[in-house]
Amino acid sequence: MKNEMKIKLFSYDHRLLDQSVRKIIKSSQDSGAKVKGPIPLPTKKEIFTICRSPHVNKTSREQFERRTHQRLIILLNTTEKTKEYLKNIIIPSGVDIQITLR
């Protein structure tokens, strides 16, 4: 029976994201799991347009952008040891994690 774990990471800062990915891959390899990835997923880009003036000057606007970077890591042949190793990793607060078990 194969145990497969998919870990999807999200962050606005790609440096924090890559640092977290390295930590997860290192601890997974130490526990004996086979690692596929990191697979970079498409970056989501959101643009917000806001009027600078509260009353007139409709043509005076400012645009803000938010990019969400994503990575996917697939772990094969995971064991309880792998799960314990992953629980002990300290991930920065700017990184969100979504884990799917199969």
Swiss-Prot record:
The keyword Ribonucleoprotein applies. GO terms for biological process: translation. It comes from the Bacteria. One of its GO terms (cellular component) is ribonucleoprotein complex. Keywords: Ribonucleoprotein, Ribosomal protein. PANTHER family: 30S RIBOSOMAL PROTEIN S10 FAMILY MEMBER (PTHR11700). Belongs to the universal ribosomal protein uS10 family. Part of the 30S ribosomal subunit. This is Small ribosomal subunit protein uS10. It comes from Malacoplasma penetrans (strain HF-2).
